[in-house]
Curated annotation (Swiss-Prot):
Superkingdom: Bacteria
Species whose genome carries this gene: Geobacillus thermodenitrificans (strain NG80-2)
Protein name, entry field: Putative regulatory protein GTNG_1019
HAMAP family noted in UniProt: RemA (MF_01503)
Disulfide bond positions: none
Family: Belongs to the RemA family.
Length: 87
């Protein structure tokens, strides 16, 4: 079985099969989703202290913050800029 991982910046990877959506963090509803995830302990901050540019929501209700643009993450998801692991 082949698992596809997407690089979300600074050596961090997310399973492509678990991603539901990739959005910009600028709108008020997304900011509320981030705050709710923080309170529930389901927030993963992969920005390494940099500005959040993309918010990735997974099927397990985890919210992942990335400093990579949403368009870049989407291109990696649907393009050839990905990593695979057999397992």
């Amino acid at each position: 079985m082949m698992m596809k991982f997407i690089n979300i910046g600074y050596g961090n990877m997310v399973s492509a099969a678990r991603i539901i959506t990739i959005v910009s963090p600028d709108s008020a509803p997304i900011k509320r989703i981030i705050q709710d995830a923080r309170e529930k302990g389901k927030l993963v901050d992969a920005t390494h202290g940099r500005r959040t540019r993309a918010v990735i929501i997974t099927d397990s209700d985890h919210v992942i913050l990335s400093s990579v643009q949403p368009e870049t993450v989407a291109n990696r998801l649907y393009g050839s800029d990905d990593f695979s692991e057999e397992g």
